[in-house]
């Protein structure tokens, strides 16, 4: 489920032929949000909006750290909580002579049929 949030994130559907489609679709949305270290606020906003669309409790703090809560289900409603941790920022580095603005430009994904790797260019 790709969220319909504002501001909308434009994707080129580069990964549509790969599986799992839903996960890679979300990855493509996130790749289109510039998020170098110290510039992850828009990515954090997107995660909060997506979680909220899914009916989850979500909030972002002043440092763009995001907390999403999902209640237990299937008989585990009273189980101890589970915490998963990750990060939204990227370590931004480019080859000499490459013109790319990590503050404003989305990552351009490409998929090559002869490899299972995802590459950016």
Where are these regions (language model features)?
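Intrinsically disordered, low-complexity segments enriched in polar/charged residues with Gly/Pro
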Residues: 17, 43-45, 54-56, 94-98, ...
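Short "domain-exit" segments at the C-terminal end of structured domains
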Residues: 117-121
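Active-site metal-coordination/substrate-binding segment of hydrolases
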Residues: 77-116
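Flexible, glycine/proline-enriched loop segments at strand-loop-helix junctions
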Residues: 33, 37, 116
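A non-catalytic alpha/beta surface segment that caps or lines the substrate-entry region
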Residues: 36-83
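N-terminal hydrophobic or amphipathic helices/low-complexity stretches enriched
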Residues: 1-33
